[in-house]
């Protein structure tokens, strides 16, 4: 949805190199709407696509009229996605916990050591973030997963054993989700709309499976009532929609 002209040209060039003689770029918001079956005259209206991916966030306003889907405005952040949620969990929860148990002074002054440890912790961060989508607390232990985090400054093996609550997770990642919500607010405000003007809100991307973001979108201050929240669309909505195009 936020591709530049250069990125679009590169995508078309790659398609031609792959042997596709006739092809057309399908915008991600259109793909999401097609995956929901919105290319139907029975579903005319205005829809907000909330696409929170692994590395980027896109919001798009889509108009459906007589079965024709049109993206009439978009906004997003190319540096906001699931990886930012994991980094927030690492920085605000996991690293402080390890610093309480181990001597990590050199990790503060040596960039490559700090980066290596933080990268190793992103897997546990994602695992716990997903687990807390379905539970109020989650446990993690490197002993159970044979994960090597290296040694601290005293030569002691670094092991992570921690329990995280949903409230802790919200405190760590809520700011990132709020950035996405604010982007949607700006998009609606720019077009003179609010949540009451939408037929519904389409959630796309793995992070939207979390109840945390759905609860934030339902807050009165965000102008989204619960009736506007749809279940998250399948993660493969773009290729699925492309397959429909090939079929037709």
Question: What do the predicted segments below correspond to?
Answer:
Residues 1-248:
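Oxyanion-binding/catalytic loops of NTP- or PPi-dependent enzymes
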């Amino acid at each position: 949805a936020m591709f530049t002209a250069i990125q679009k040209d590169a995508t078309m060039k790659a398609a031609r190199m792959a042997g596709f003689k006739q092809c057309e770029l399908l915008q991600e918001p259109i793909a999401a709407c097609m995956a929901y079956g919105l290319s139907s005259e029975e579903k005319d209206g205005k829809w907000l696509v909330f696409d929170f991916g692994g590395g980027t966030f896109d919001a798009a306003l889509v108009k459906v009229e007589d079965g024709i889907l049109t993206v009439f405005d978009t906004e997003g952040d190319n540096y906001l996605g699931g990886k930012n949620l994991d980094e927030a969990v690492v920085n605000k929860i996991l690293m402080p916990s390890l610093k309480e148990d181990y001597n990590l002074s050199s990790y503060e002054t040596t960039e490559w050591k700090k980066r290596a440890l933080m990268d190793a912790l992103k897997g546990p961060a994602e695992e716990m973030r997903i687990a807390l989508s379905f539970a109020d607390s989650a446990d993690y232990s490197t002993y159970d997963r044979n994960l090597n985090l290296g040694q601290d400054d005293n030569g002691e093996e670094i092991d992570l054993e921690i329990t995280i609550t949903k409230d802790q997770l919200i405190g760590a990642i809520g700011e990132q989700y709020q950035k996405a919500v604010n982007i949607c607010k700006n998009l609606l405000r720019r077009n003179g709309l609010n949540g009451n003007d939408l037929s519904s809100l389409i959630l796309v991307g793995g992070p939207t499976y979390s109840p945390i973001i759905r609860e934030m979108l339902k807050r009165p201050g965000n102008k989204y009532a619960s009736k506007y929240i749809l279940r998250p669309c399948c993660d493969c909505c773009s290729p699925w929609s492309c397959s429909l195009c090939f079929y037709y």
